């Protein structure tokens, strides 16, 4: 409770940002946390603008998007910034999470910091799915049908949950109103949780590539690391503005530029690229309920990492060869799952997706703890040899 109490001490935030002591050896990999917050703010600001013109009804939702693109002054630019900003937001968060995993940023005393980040990520996925449905294109509608129907597999209460979510016996205006309201609300909750996340970070202090707490090799956050953050933000801003001006629809699916049609089903339903990983796990399991559980567990399992890897003597992955090996294997598994999620459900990709889904959980629950054990043995051998 002490950490949560201090996390709400908002009056200390200004002092914390200016005089926060930061290790001198942290690299640009540590900038993705700030970049994630930056793109979250962009999403909120552009989302508020789009909310002024969006009509959450199955008859006019798609038309209102076209109206924003074609009739509102610079509406196409703001909507492109919102759509592409979501991709950049997830990209930065993924880099941020994998960096934390590689350098063991979840170890004591940062367990609560890691868990708050996982909760933020879970809400991000939900928010992104809700936003994906709102344009009411062909892919949006079918994606909403597939994902919301999964809830019906929950025993006893599944059908009631789906009925409550849909607002009826099928997806209709009430569904879009619900999704619209939740999609507008959740980013503000994400901002609130992000403030807590940052406060927890400033309470425990930042890690560094060496994984060794330092009481002397530290400098104030301002102005040194502010300049690094600003440089990173400017670089990413150039990239997103270039995409937004040259090809704002580059990251969108072609079928989502067709209005939703209840009578036509696309041959291959895919979500946005940043959700393909979860979609691959979902469809790899033939049972609807088990697939839904596996998809949720793929995020929830990240909460147990601080406990199953708490016995690590060496923190940084740079000095743990087995952890480093299993980390890169894990990264390759995640990338392959995302690739499988964008491919039609045919052999051999279906079997490959099932194998990779199993390996994902095996890597987290077995290989990572095993790596700690092996690295400890290697460390003991090294100590014994040097004593001689």
Question: Which positions does each model-derived feature cover?
Answer:
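Membrane-embedded and interfacial regions of multi-pass energy-transducing membrane proteins
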Residues: 1-388
């Amino acid at each position: 409770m002490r950490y949560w109490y201090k996390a709400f001490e908002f009056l200390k935030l200004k002092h914390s940002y200016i005089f926060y002591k930061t290790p001198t050896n942290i690299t640009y990999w540590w900038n993705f946390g700030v970049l994630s917050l930056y793109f979250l703010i962009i999403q909120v600001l552009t989302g508020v603008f789009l909310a002024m013109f969006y009509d959450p009804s199955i008859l006019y939702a798609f038309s209102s998007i076209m109206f924003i693109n074609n009739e509102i002054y610079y509406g196409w630019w703001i909507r492109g910034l919102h759509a592409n900003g979501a991709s950049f937001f997830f990209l930065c968060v993924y880099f941020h999470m994998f960096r934390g995993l590689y350098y063991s940023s979840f170890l004591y005393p940062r367990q609560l910091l890691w868990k708050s980040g996982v909760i933020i990520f879970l809400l991000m996925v939900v928010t992104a799915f809700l936003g994906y449905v709102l344009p009411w294109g062909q892919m949006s509608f079918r994606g909403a049908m597939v994902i919301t129907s999964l809830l019906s597999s929950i025993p006893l209460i599944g059908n009631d949950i789906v009925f409550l979510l849909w607002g009826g016996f099928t997806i209709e205006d009430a569904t879009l109103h619900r999704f619209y309201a939740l999609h507008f609300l959740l980013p503000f909750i994400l901002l609130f949780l992000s403030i807590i996340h940052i406060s927890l970070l400033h309470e425990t202090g930042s890690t560094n590539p060496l994984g060794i707490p330092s009481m002397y090799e530290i400098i104030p956050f301002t102005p040194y690391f502010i300049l690094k953050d600003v440089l990173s933000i400017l670089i990413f801003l150039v990239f997103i503005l270039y995409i937004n001006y040259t090809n704002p629809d580059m990251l969108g699916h072609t079928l989502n530029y067709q209005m939703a049609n209840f009578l036509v089903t696309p041959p291959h339903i895919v979500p946005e690229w940043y959700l393909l990983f979860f979609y691959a796990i979902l469809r790899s399991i033939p049972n609807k309920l088990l697939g839904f559980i596996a998809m949720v567990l793929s995020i929830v399992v990240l909460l147990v990492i601080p406990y199953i890897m708490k016995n690590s003597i060496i923190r940084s992955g740079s000095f743990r060869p087995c952890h480093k090996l299993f980390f890169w294997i894990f990264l390759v598994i995640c990338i392959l799952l995302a690739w499988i999620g964008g491919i039609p459900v045919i052999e051999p990709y279906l079997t490959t997706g099932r194998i990779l889904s199993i390996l994902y959980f095996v890597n987290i629950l077995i290989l990572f703890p095993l790596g700690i054990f092996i690295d400890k043995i290697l460390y003991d051998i090294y100590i014994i040899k040097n004593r001689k």
